[in-house]
Amino acid sequence: MNIIMKRKPSEPNLWKYILAGIFFGAIIKIFILDILSVKGISMEPAIHDNEKIIVCNLSYGIINPFGNSTFIRWKNAKPGDIVVYFYKNNLVVKRCVAADGDSLEYSSNSGYTLHVGEKNYPLTELQYNLMKNSPCVPRGMILAIGDNFENSIDSRTYGFVAQKNILGKVIFK
């Protein structure tokens, strides 16, 4: 006597789809796009406090998921780009105002000023003394300054930012 058992048609395994969704979501967030909420007014009027931004993590290279730098780099930030990088274990959003090789000029007449192209940025005496010996942006670095430069802690305070430490470019706000 032969017994034939009918197999039930396979039902979709919901857990497979959930795990696949989580996996692909993590890959997208780590390597492709990230949504961040900006804290602070240093980038006003371009980006306001508590505003959400979308960062393309592939703009300059592939991010090292276990560090604060790019693993493989194919492009450098250029002046005008709004970039995201780490400073003291915090993500920072600033505008690249000069890239490697760009000339920097300083003035101490009636206050301290940094001249980059057509733009002038105020400096404190301490910032002036820290920066005045750099006639240009060093190779592999950028000068990153907040658009609201009167209320920004940026490259004028902590120095140039290494291109390899830039994690992405703001593409939408």
PLM regions and their residue ranges:
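Protein maturation boundaries and topogenic segments
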Residues: 1-91, 159-173
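Acidic/glycine-rich C-terminal interaction modules and beta/coil loop segments
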Residues: 39-48, 118, 123, 127-172
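Structural motif
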Residues: 50-51, 81-82, 102, 141, ...
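Solvent-exposed loop/turn segments at secondary-structure junctions
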Residues: 60-61, 89-90, 103-104, 149-151
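Residue-level detection of beta-strand-connecting loop/turn positions
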Residues: 89, 117-118
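Short beta-strand-centered aromatic/proline hotspots
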Residues: 93-100
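Short, solvent-exposed secondary-structure boundary/capping segments
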Residues: 104-110
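Short polybasic amphipathic segments
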Residues: 110-117
